[in-house]
Amino acid sequence: MAAGPTTAEKSGASGAKRSSKGSSDGPSRPGTRNRKFRMPGTRALLITLGVLLLVAGGLWALYGSTWFRVERVKTSGTSVLTPREVEAAAAVPLGAPLVTVDTDAIEARIRKELPRVDSVDVVRSWPHGIGLKVTERKPVLLIEKGGKFIEVDATGMRFATVDTAPRNVPRLVLDSASSPSLRRFDADRLLQEAVGVRGELPAEIARDTRVVRITSYDSVTLELTRGRTVFWGSGEHGAVKARVLTALLKATPKAGHFDVSAPTAPASSGS
């Protein structure tokens, strides 16, 4: 009877199988790496080179060439100011690459040098221009001082002093020197109150208003054309007071004095 394989023979056979399996797996790994890290082809290299050349050319055109340089500045929107005044304050760097112009810095210079400017948009106008779109402040009240007139805008800002009063802009009179209101509200606070009242006036009444007189927080009087006066009171309920005053002026056109300080109980008197 033939004897079976010994333990040593079994171990040898098993080892041979593992060795054979390992040898079959070994050569495939280098091939896998070669396929994964294959060098790019000629077409890919040419495309990459073309993109780089386009980028470099674009940068040179914007920064290095004379194609896109600032050659002119155009100002629009001025009324009292002149384009030359705005452009002098802007100090746009002529000859500089258009792409490098600091538009925020230009805006800041204009606003600093010209308080009359309420806002300005600085825009690049390719290929050679800078545009300055200006919005000027408009006076709603005038403060007379030393024979000149200080212009006040709708925010209460004093922005300019002029020799001649603009047409149809009422004069502000602050009769508050001896008023107890100054203990609680300073002159600037009363100015804001007067500006608020002026802003509530309908266009037709605003055109007829010659003086806005304020004595205290709750004592604002309007002086209209033809010697008419309006006691407005405080700035509260301004829109309602404006509607009531419009109705009173139509209902009693010959009256000389109007009181809308209490808009639910308005009154008119005189002739």
UniProtKB/Swiss-Prot annotation:
Keywords: Cell cycle, Cell division, Cell membrane, Membrane, Transmembrane, Transmembrane helix. It is found in: Cell membrane. The keyword ATP-binding does not apply. The chain crosses the membrane at residues 44-64. The keyword Cell division applies. Residues 68-137 form the POTRA domain. It is a single-pass type II membrane protein. GO terms for cellular component: cell division site; plasma membrane. Its main location: membrane. Residues 8-24 have a biased composition (Low complexity). InterPro entries: FtsQ, FtsQ_DivIB, POTRA, POTRA_FtsQ_type. Essential cell division protein. This is Cell division protein FtsQ. It comes from Streptomyces venezuelae (strain ATCC 10712 / CBS 650.69 / DSM 40230 / JCM 4526 / NBRC 13096 / PD 04745).
